[in-house]
Structure formats: C-alpha cells, structure tokens
Amino acid sequence: MRLNSIVPDFKADSTKGPIEFYDWQGDSWVLLFSHPSDFTPVCTTELGRIAVNATQFVKRNTKCLAHSVDDTQSHINWVNDIKSYCADIRGEFPFPILADPNRQLAITLGMIDEEKREDIESAKTVRALFIISPDHRVRLSMFYPMTTGRNVNEILRCIDSLQLTDRLKTVATPANWMPGSKVMILPSVTDEEAAKLFPKGFDKTSMPSGGNYVRTTENY
C-alpha cells in the first residue's frame, strides 16, 4: 500500500469476534500491524509493549489492530503468554488480533516478504505497520524484517506528528521531533504569512546558500 492509498474495506475473524473494518474503525485513526507468527519471542514483546501502552493510543483516538496468518484459536491461546510475559497488562487484552490463515489480507496490503511469495501457502508476514487516518488512507507505513522488533515510542511519535500536521497544515516536524518541541514552517509560507500565523514569533536560520527555508517555532 502506497502512502495516501485507501485501505479497502474487509471482513475478518479476530480474538474479539468478526470485524468489518470500516464499521470497526468509525472516526478513529488505526494502527494496523502484522507479526510473523504467534508463540514467537519478538512478536510477544511487540504485542506486549503495544498492549501496555494501550491508553496512550486511546488518548490519540487511535485503535490498534494486530494481524498474522495464524488462526483465531492460536491468537486466543497466545494472548495468555503475552499477558504472562508482560505482567503489567491489566484486565482483558486491549485490542483484537486478526486471523488471516488464507493470507488474503496479507497479500492485499503487501505484507508478505518478496522472497516468500512463491510459496504463499506457508508464507509469514513481515513486521508491516500502517497508520490509517479516519478517511481510510494509509498515512504512514513501516516494514521491519522478522529479526527486528518495532519501537512503540516511535509509533506514538509518528501518530503525534501526523495529527499535528493535519491540524496545522503550515508546519512539518523535523528529525527527532517530540511533542512540544520546535516545528518547522513550510517553505510555501511567506514570512508575512508566518508572522500572522505565529504571532508569538518564529526563528530564522541563515544558510550559506542564502536560502530562507529554515524557520522554526515553539509557538503552535
């Protein structure tokens, strides 16, 4: 799935019953992410850390939706291991895990490793991740190999950046940005416009080229 492409509506079984994606999403953002296989070490840590941070996603109006090619009963059994390993998960496991044993959704969303596509019936998904806005568009995607687990803080940071720049369409977030730190004013915004948009001020950095394109503000 390319950025800004629309995720098609789909139906699938999950640990929380059948899901019709568009109805389930409602007006929320969605973190849709795949893992290679249940009952494996890195996947256990990933789903565990996302579950531990469930309230952080709720604060961002973001629903989490896990996915693999295992069946529903496998997911249900595995959840007990995740909760045991991550002892700080309280109560019911906070998000559904989609079952995709026929790999239909995995193929549609391009989650299968290119080297595994010839043996699709036994292929596992890579660690694919999509942040989907309420209009069903893919706003950000990440693809990690099976050997590398994902960073939950980076996922949250990306959601914060997307939601901020949707709200303030004249700014972008720089490298290593964190909520509350400086944002960059887009080059398409003139200094005069920036002064009106950010009346508390903004900073300009002189560049050797003479360009006036590095402007930052904390007042947003």
Where are these regions (language model features)?
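Chalcogenol-based redox active-site neighborhoods
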Residues: M1-Y220
